[in-house]
Amino acid sequence: MPIPGQDKDREATANILCMASAHANSVFVAAADRVGVERGKPFVGQSLIVSYTGWPIAGPASPDREEIIYAEANLADTRRKRNWNEYNQVLRDRRTDVYDEMLGAKLSRGWY
């Protein structure tokens, strides 16, 4: 379903979020949505497949007709090629010390 305020002539917000998530986590993302209206609710379609770089490798599909999209994905590339350069290694450079306690990595009483 479209996000409130979404311009129907622009790319679906969900697709932009998929691209950002794929890039930030160095993973391939396949996002599928149906098209048309069900129970009075519209669906935006525009399914897509995104590379670990954040760029689409298939799609977006049609916003108003059924369509199947395909892409080749070398899953080994997510590990082998995710380090852009020595100063930009997204997963290595995460600051888990900032949020690990909140996620339960360091259990201590009363943090919540």
Indicate where each model-derived feature is located:
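CN hydrolase (nitrilase-like) catalytic-core segments centered on the catalytic cysteine
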Residues: 1-67
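Glycine-rich loops and low-complexity Gly/Arg-rich segments
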Residues: 21-25, 53-57, 73-75, 83, ...
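Flexible domain-boundary/linker segments
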Residues: 35, 39, 64, 71, ...
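A short, polar/charged loop-to-alpha-helix boundary motif
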Residues: 65-85
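Cysteine/selenocysteine-centered motifs that mediate thiol-based redox chemistry or coordinate metal-sulfur cofactors
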Residues: 78-112
